[in-house]
Amino acid sequence: MPKQVDHRERRETIARALWRVVDQRGVQQLTLREVAQEAGISLGQLQHYFASRKAMLTFAMDLAAEQTAERVGQGLRGLGEHPHPREVLRVMLLETLPLHPDARATSRMSAAYVLEALHDEDVRTRARGGLLEGRALVEHLLRQAVADGHLAADRDPAVETGLLLALTGFTTLLELGAVTAEEVVAAVDSHLDRLFGGG
């Protein structure tokens, strides 16, 4: 059992090194050699854990998704036992956007994965599956909100899901300094207020 933990730990260390390469030097520098150097190990050692760039990138993306889910879970626990769906969606949206260092690292990892997905069918299928899963979760929350009377019955959950997910488009604007974090949070809050009848 300890060997498995060590193996997972080493893979996570390599994945975090990959995040740093993406964050500090860009996707174009994302090679096995570059990541090995960043992780402080030899190329051979890295290849013991990841046979290919794609395997390494996929694991790093899975870890980024896990980290985001953990942050969302932590935020949701802070809302108490029966949080309003508006607050649940707010936590989910804000933790997806690069508003703080941890979210920025996972967001940049996601961007690297999307670029890879454009040219690799396997990666595209996997990435698309994750996005569809996220979309289904948001739509389920909205359908439940309608059923519970938190959201007007004339709201179309599928359309509203699309509009909520469109807010993640702030990622590019934030990364390029076209908007501030405060402006993004205000826009998210304004949209949620209108959606749930508070504005």
Regions found by a protein language model. Name each.
Residues 94-101, 108-120, 190-195:
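Helix-loop "lid/cap" segments that line or gate small-molecule binding pockets
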Residues 51-55, 80, 101, 105, ...:
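Residues in soluble alpha-helical coiled-coils and helical-bundle/repeat scaffolds
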Residues 59, 70-106, 157-164, 185:
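Hydrophobic alpha-helical connector segments
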Residues 1, 91-93, 97-98, 135-136, ...:
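C-terminal peripheral helix-coil segments that are non-catalytic and often amphipathic
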Residues 13, 17-59:
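Helix-turn-helix
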Residues 104, 124-128, 132, 146-195:
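Hydrophobic/aromatic-rich alpha-helical bundle segments in the mid-to-C-terminal region
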Residues 7-18, 35, 60-64, 68, ...:
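Generic hydrophobic, amphipathic alpha-helix propensity
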Residues 69-70, 102-111, 121-148:
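Amphipathic alpha-helical packing segments from all-alpha helical-bundle domains
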